[in-house]
């Protein structure tokens, strides 16, 4: 279990772009389960869409990538303060299945598929109340800053 203070040790992101509120399960080298609470106060809703707020798919992808980054950093025993950064390197097989709206709790799940020379591949999904909202295969690269 990781609260937002510990999450901030493993992700360089800050408001309004820190998209993981809590980690509820993490098995180093294997998987992570985290969540993001979606509130009407999200900056993105000022433009997407003011009269019918929908959390953008690209933000769901970013949230899955951030959860994957935490898993990668914890697995490697590194933190951004050590001079490492985890970069979003690619995304494949993206599917959006359900809108995510204010009041939803977006559960983020990521599983390590492979790692080779600092390039990590993750199978990710985001759900709301057990219903699939999005899925993707995400590539991240561990690089020195």
Curated annotation (Swiss-Prot):
| Enzyme Commission code(s) on record | 4.2.1.59
Gene Ontology cellular-component annotations: cytoplasm; membrane
Indicate where this protein resides in the cell.
Answer: Cytoplasm
Identify which residues the record assigns to the active site.
48
Q: Which UniProt keywords apply?
A: Cytoplasm, Lipid A biosynthesis, Lipid biosynthesis, Lipid metabolism, Lyase
Molecular-function GO term, any one: (3R)-hydroxyacyl-[acyl-carrier-protein] dehydratase activity
GO biological process annotation, one example: fatty acid biosynthetic process
Q: Which reaction does it catalyse?
A: a (3R)-hydroxyacyl-[ACP] = a (2E)-enoyl-[ACP] + H2O
Signal peptide (from-to): none
Q: Which InterPro entries match?
A: FabA_FabZ, FabZ, HotDog_dom_sf
Q: What class of enzyme is it?
A: lyase
Main role?
Involved in unsaturated fatty acids biosynthesis. Catalyzes the dehydration of short chain beta-hydroxyacyl-ACPs and long chain saturated and unsaturated beta-hydroxyacyl-ACPs.
UniProt lists the family membership as follows:
Belongs to the thioester dehydratase family. FabZ subfamily.
Name of the protein in its database record: 3-hydroxyacyl-[acyl-carrier-protein] dehydratase FabZ
């Amino acid at each position: 279990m990781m609260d937002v203070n510990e999450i901030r040790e493993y992700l360089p992101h800050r408001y309004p772009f820190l998209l993981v509120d809590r980690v509820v399960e993490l098995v180093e080298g294997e998987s992570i389960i985290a969540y993001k609470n979606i509130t009407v106060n999200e900056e993105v809703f000022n433009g997407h869409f003011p009269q019918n707020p929908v959390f953008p798919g690209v933000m769901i992808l970013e949230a899955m990538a951030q959860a994957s980054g935490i898993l990668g950093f914890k697995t490697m025993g590194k933190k951004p303060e050590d001079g490492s950064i985890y970069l979003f390197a690619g995304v494949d097989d993206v599917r959006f299945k359900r809108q995510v709206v204010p009041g939803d709790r977006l559960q983020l799940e990521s599983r390590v598929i492979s790692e080779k020379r600092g390039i990590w591949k993750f199978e990710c999904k985001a759900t709301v109340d057990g219903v699939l909202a999005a899925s993707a295969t995400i590539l991240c690269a561990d690089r020195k800053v």
